[in-house]
Structures are given as structure tokens and as C-alpha cells.
UniProtKB/Swiss-Prot annotation:
Enzyme class, spelled out: ligase
Biological source species: Metallosphaera sedula (strain ATCC 51363 / DSM 5348 / JCM 9185 / NBRC 15509 / TH2)
In-chain residues carrying the UniProt-annotated modification N6-acetyllysine: K617
EC numbers, comma separated: 6.2.1.36
Protein name per the record: 3-hydroxypropionyl-coenzyme A synthetase
Amino acid sequence: MFMRYIMVEEQTLKTGSQELEEKADYNMRYYAHLMKLSKEKPAEFWGSLAQDLLDWYEPWKETMRQEDPMTRWFIGGKINASYNAVDRHLNGPRKFKAAVIWESELGERKIVTYQDMFYEVNRWANALRSLGVGKGDRVTIYMPLTPEGIAAMLASARIGAIHSVIFAGFGSQAIADRVEDAKAKVVITADAYPRRGKVVELKKTVDEALNSLGERSPVQHVLVYRRMKTDVNMKEGRDVFFDEVGKYRYVEPERMDSNDPLFILYTSGTTGKPKGIMHSTGGYLTGTAVMLLWSYGLSQENDVLFNTSDIGWIVGHSYITYSPLIMGRTVVIYESAPDYPYPDKWAEIIERYRATTFGTSATALRYFMKYGDEYVKNHDLSSIRIIVTNGEVLNYSPWKWGLEVLGGGKVFMSHQWWQTETGAPNLGYLPGIIYMPMKSGPASGFPLPGNFVEVLDENGNPSAPRVRGYLVMRPPFPPNMMMGMWNDNGERLKKTYFSKFGSLYYPGDFAMVDEDGYIWVLGRADETLKIAAHRIGAGEVESAITSHPSVAEAAVIGVPDSVKGEEVHAFVVLKQGYAPSSELAKDIQSHVRKVMGPIVSPQIHFVDKLPKTRSGKVMRRVIKAVMMGSSAGDLTTIEDEASMDEIKKAVEELKKELKTS
């Protein structure tokens, strides 16, 4: 059975301006107008935006076509992503404007103008051409977060190749799987890069991956960027250094069909091999550019985006590489973890470059909060207008901290919902064009124009207000939606996303709609706890726990129980100033029972840190494996291995308690 849902510490906050508040009614009516237009005339709605924001070699013959099950956009149009991101800015004042600003944990800094980026993209494109890469070939990119990684992506797009970026934290098996599936002709990598005081050897990992494939390896060449100038093994005839072949020569951009694939980005499935999500060229560029202006709020020429994501994820594709450069903005990137070498490194970067939008993950915000307020107060963060979070559910406590401490009560907190598959935000707010009243915690806001998102019950009917249901999206899907899956005839696509509700896209998330129309995404449906016939999302319990004033972070798992079905265990990280104790554990437990009812009474385990991926997602499967005494599986993406020791220690203490009780 599903529970009726009352959110913890729910608030509807004003926009912070009396003048804007007086316009609130108009703002919501304008939002309703945009939604109505995008629903009744989707071709006209998206077509006008594509014409206004992008440069096309040839106009499309058909704006939209609904197929089974995806929507095709701008059919017959000719375009090039690299030209739109770089070349078209060189005949005006953006030529010498900063396109990318980069820092490393070693203190290195680099400002890359649009003119510089044009030069670098052509160098990389020329290098790829010299290695035999052409239109339709796949190029795997395994690079740290540097301007060179961005240039390599744009160079692939320039010559019509399809890039497949792999996050630099992945291990050799993940690389081997993706390279083999994509049949990559060339792998672009770096010798090594610094991460939390250590040297991460990328070329060595690529060698291990290709060696494991043996004769199955499709790779003809490995192109190596000398990031740290370390000694690496170079296989004769296959491996080549970028500085030896990356000579500047103008490369004419390939005229691509709007529905030619721009990239493949692999996302892990719950079972089986990773899914190669394919995005088109014209549609993807249109949708991401629109949401950069509207949802990320970079609507002004001099706006600056500091994004803590990575090019190995969809956020880094959409809101580091493509849309900021498509729209001629400045994006700031930091190669290492945003809290290294000191906790307020991220705040220092915001202050130094006067970022106007700060993009980060919900998990990272919780992590920053753990260090306390003083680190933030040491910096002038007044340039920030908008804080954008995505990834995991944003609980109330970090939402409030971001608004009041980081933003001084004057920023717009825009928690978005979207996926690798959808390419750009689908739920959220529109701070770039209108201010809408914010709701706290995991409220993702409203369906964004052109995105027809609903919450349905098990039978496919609209869920009642505050009753949890399933998040779905109706066609026509926005242009930034995936075009399909690599190496798939459509069967896996339909089975994965369209088997539960027919023609409706089902991403696998729980959600609810409140009485005001706000949609709250409650977490993955496959992370459900089954307690005495009740199905409760792990994210719901985590939200209740983190609403306790002492808690910075929490991860919840279920362990089989012969009586209740599952017993809830919570691993809790405390804020500075609080110490673990049995009394505090009981107080947190009582708080959760009060918020969620007596049916939910989690066992509390205190830890100093939670195991997370380098993208900031909590590795709940790893925690559960330790609890169950089973193998933790692949740990190559873990951010801090010491977090595993924390979990093991907590489990051992639990076992001792059980023996003595």
C-alpha cells in the first residue's frame, strides 16, 4: 500500500523581492501560457526556439514526427555542434571572451577564450583526422576535467564522429565494456591527473582495458594528452602523443543531419551491460540551450556558470561543454573534488570568478554543509543569483542551508529532475525568465515547458494529491530527449522505459503531486523498503532523518527481517558540533517515528563519511553488501575508500551489541 505523504519541514518561500512578489500571479500565468503553447503547438514552440538560438546550414523539412516510441525533431535540417559552440562567436565581441576558466588542485589556472577554443578544437580535429577518424566513427574520451577534454568532445563533433565520454574515475573493466560496445576507433586519454593529493594514472588504466579485450579490441589508436608529463608506456603503431600530431590546421565542420547521433553516453543498468544512451545533434542542442537560459538562469550575456559536475556525466555534457558555449557564456570548471585541498575550495572559486549560477549535486551540498557555516562566511558569494542542484533527492535541511547560508537568503534554489536519457531538465523552475514561488526540500517544481510530466498510480490513473505514485512523461518528448540506445533495435529501449505504461516514458522514480501542482520526486522505485506491508522509499526516510538538527547526511538501507519484512538501518553523518551517543541515536529515532509514524523506526549507526561515487551519489548497494556480508562488487568509482572502513566499523559494533544483548 502507498502512504499519504506530508513533507518534512515543508515551506513555500517567497522570491525575496516585494516587486517580484507583486508579479507572482503574472509569472504563473505566463508559465501556464508557455505550457499551453508547447502542448497545443509543440512544433511551433520548439521550432521557433531552434531557429532563434542555433545556426543551421539548411532548414529542416519537417519540425516534428512522433514515432514508436520516440519523437524525432527538425528532420532534414543540417547543423554542426562545434560550429555553433565556437566558430559563430568569432565575428563579434565574444571572440576574446572567456569560454572556459579552469583550475586544478595544484594551483594551476587557465582562461580559454573563444578564440583559444577555436584553435584547440581545430588541433584536436586535425589530430583525429590524421588517425583516420571520420563521420560516424566512434571516439572514446577518457579524460580529466580540463579544457582539453572539452576541446576533444567538440573536435569529434566537428568532424562528424560520435564521442563516448567515460568518467575518469571508472576502472579498466568499465572502459573495456564501453569501448567494445561502441566499437571505438580511437581512445583519447591523458597520462595522469591529480585527485585529492594522489596521481591517477589514466593511460595505464586504458592499457589494462585494451589488454583485457585482446583481439576483440576495436581500437586502432590511443591519443595521449600529456597532462602531467609522467612516463607512460606507448605501444608502437597504436599510441601517439597529442602534441606530436595535434598541429593547427583549419578543419571545415561536417554538415550533420539534425538526427545524426552527437554522442553516446553510457549509464549503468540495474542488471546487465551498461546502456548506451544516444542523443541527436539538432534536438539535443536546442533543448539544452533553452534550459540553460530558462532553468539554469544564464539569460544574461555576462552570466558565469560554475558547475561541479564532470564531462563524464550528462550534466557535464549539457551544462559544461555544449549549452554554455552554444550560448556564448563563461563556464568555470575545477579538476578536483570541490572540497579539496580545503573544505571551502568551491566557495573560493565562486568568489574569485563571480559566478552567477552555481551548479552542484544535492549530495555535494550536504557534504559542504557538514563542515559548518564559517567556511562559507569567509567568502563573498553575493554574485550568486541561482543555485541549481540535481542528482539525488534534495532533503529539506541542505535546501534550507543552501538558501540561507550559501545564498544569504537572496538566491533562487532550483532543484531539478532529469536524467542521462532526457538530456536536460524536465522538472524545475524558470528563474532565467520568471520567478516562481519555491517549495522546500525534494520539490522539483513544475514540468518545464515542452515536458509533459505526470504522476500516476499503479493503474495508470492520476495520483491523488500527496499520494505517492510513479513519475511518467507523455509524448511528444522534448528535443533533448534521447533518440534511442546504441546497438539496440528498439527492444531494449521499450523494455526498459515503456513496458509499464505503454507509450508513456517511465524512468523508474516515485513521485507525488501536491495540492498546488508541485511535483516532488521521492527517489528510485527500486530503492523501496518493505516494512509490514508498507512500501516506503529510502529517500523518504533519509529526508526525515536529515530534518533532525544534528544530521548532515544519511543513507538508509533495508535488511531482511522475518517479522517485518525488512528492518531499516540508517548510517548517519553528524554536523560539526555534535558527537555520537546512544541518547542522540534514540532522539533521531524518535524524530523519525514522529515524522513518519511508528512503523518506521530505523537503527541508527554513526559514521564520519558515507561511501560515494566521484559524481556524489551515495553507494547504498555497497552499504547493504557490507551489512549482508556479501561482496561489495566494483569499487572503482568510490570517492574515498576510507568510507568503507567506516561502514565496516559500524557493522562490527552492531554485531557486538547483538551478541551481548
